[in-house]
Swiss-Prot record:
PANTHER family: 50S RIBOSOMAL PROTEIN L31, CHLOROPLASTIC (PTHR33280), LARGE RIBOSOMAL SUBUNIT PROTEIN BL31C (PTHR33280:SF1). The keyword NADP does not apply. One of its GO terms (biological process) is translation. It comes from Erwinia tasmaniensis (strain DSM 17950 / CFBP 7177 / CIP 109463 / NCPPB 4357 / Et1/99). The lineage of its organism: Bacteria, Pseudomonadati, Pseudomonadota, Gammaproteobacteria, Enterobacterales. GO terms for cellular component: ribonucleoprotein complex; ribosome. The keyword Ribosomal protein applies. SUPFAM superfamilies: L28p-like. This is Large ribosomal subunit protein bL31B. Keywords: Ribonucleoprotein, Ribosomal protein. The gene is rpmE2.
Length: 86
């Protein structure tokens, strides 16, 4: 086997900046940034979305049948379209 071809596997601090939550996960991602977390200096990767802030996991998702563009269209023009069918 060839030596020195595998990426370094180490603990990395992923930071969800939206929810201000940290996840410590083993990863091979390359980053030059570091952060002090629980007394350890770890490689740092900022995230925009994770399970801490994604609407599917937080339960704050919108019901598109009630709040979507189709519902707004039906609210504006539904009576007009219903009258034309008669």
């Amino acid at each position: 086997m060839k030596s020195d071809i595998h990426p370094a596997y180490r603990q990395v601090a992923f930071h969800d900046t939206t929810a201000d939550a940290y996840f410590i996960v083993g990863s091979t991602i390359k980053t030059d940034r570091t952060v002090q977390y629980e007394g350890k200096e770890l490689p740092y990767v900022p995230l925009d979305v994770s399970s801490a802030s994604h609407v599917y996991y937080t339960g704050k998702q919108k019901d598109f049948a009630k709040e979507g563009s189709a519902a707004r269209f039906n609210q504006r023009f539904g009576s007009f379209l219903g009258a034309m069918k008669k």
